[in-house]
């Protein structure tokens, strides 16, 4: 037996979204933008290792398999792996919800599943942070999967400097939970200056979300990271034709001061 295995970009990093808080190597779309912005000087796709993996897979009876990204529903080989799994395997999938899930449903309709659909808050928040996303389409695909798997389908978020006070709005739209705080880059909660932090905390106090309140109360402001984040945002706003202040006007003083 192999208790669990995770396919984290083992089939490449193909992805159709450029999420702000992503990182080099995890998303082909993010890499493409970073290359255009001269943040990286080369752009190579992450190679697929599926051939060897599928051969090795035959040696094990896997109890739990997790498919992450890139965007797992864009990677054909993921479905090849799924089709070889025993129906007793719990299959976990993290998807951005933009890809038609019909093939996923056909492949896994008889499996035990846990489907996490990534979003960052309501429509405008998700579409800004997860650039390229269409929240209406995401909701359509979410509902398609929920009709098959019920409460095994849920929204999940990252908890970052931009969205923390908007996450509870997602809870009113569909079944959802707040995921884990961003810790690997400057979109962490430490990039929130004290005045905006107080504003966000007041909003969360009114809602009463204890977990989000604790995360934010424990965050120590790092001004250097805040400016790094805003420069990162400004470069992408110019490239994409977007504007942070259309969705997060509370950042106006800092955004307009930032030389990105």
Indicate where each model-derived feature is located.
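Generic structural signal for well-ordered alpha-helical scaffold segments
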Residues: 54-55, 143
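N-terminal pre-core extensions flanking Radical SAM catalytic domains
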Residues: 1-42, 58-59, 213-260
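Conserved C-terminal portion of the radical SAM core fold
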Residues: 92, 111-116, 136-259
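Residues at alpha-helix caps and immediate loop-helix transition turns in enzyme cores, especially N-
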Residues: 77-78, 104, 134, 166-170
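Core AdoMet radical
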Residues: 2-14, 25-48, 60-75, 86-102, ...
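Leucine-rich repeat
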Residues: 49-54, 78-80, 103-104
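A general structural signal for stabilizing positions within well-ordered secondary structure
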Residues: 56-57, 107, 147
């Amino acid at each position: 037996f192999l208790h669990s295995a995770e396919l984290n970009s083992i089939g490449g990093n193909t992805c159709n979204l450029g999420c702000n808080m992503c990182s080099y190597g995890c998303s082909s779309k993010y890499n493409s933008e970073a290359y255009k912005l001269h943040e990286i000087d080369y752009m190579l796709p992450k190679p697929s290792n599926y051939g060897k993996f599928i051969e090795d897979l035959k040696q094990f009876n896997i109890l739990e398999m997790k498919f992450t990204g890139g965007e797992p529903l864009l990677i054909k080989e993921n479905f090849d792996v799924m089709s070889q799994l025993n129906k007793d395997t719990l299959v976990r999938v993290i998807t951005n919800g933009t890809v038609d899930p019909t093939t996923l449903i056909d492949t896994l309709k008889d499996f035990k599943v846990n489907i996490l659909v990534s979003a960052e808050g309501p429509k405008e928040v998700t579409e800004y942070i997860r650039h390229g996303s269409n929240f209406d389409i995401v909701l359509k695909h979410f509902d398609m999967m929920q009709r098959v798997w019920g409460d095994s389908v849920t929204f999940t978020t990252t908890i970052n400097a931009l969205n923390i006070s908007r996450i509870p709005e997602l809870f009113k739209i569909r079944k959802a939970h707040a995921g884990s705080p961003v810790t690997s880059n400057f979109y962490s909660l430490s990039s929130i200056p004290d005045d905006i932090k107080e504003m966000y905390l007041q909003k969360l106090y009114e809602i009463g979300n204890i977990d989000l309140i604790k995360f934010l109360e424990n965050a120590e402001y790092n001004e250097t990271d805040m400016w790094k984040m805003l420069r990162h945002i400004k470069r992408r706003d110019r490239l994409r034709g977007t504007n942070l202040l259309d969705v997060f006007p509370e950042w106006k003083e800092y955004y307009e001061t930032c030389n990105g």
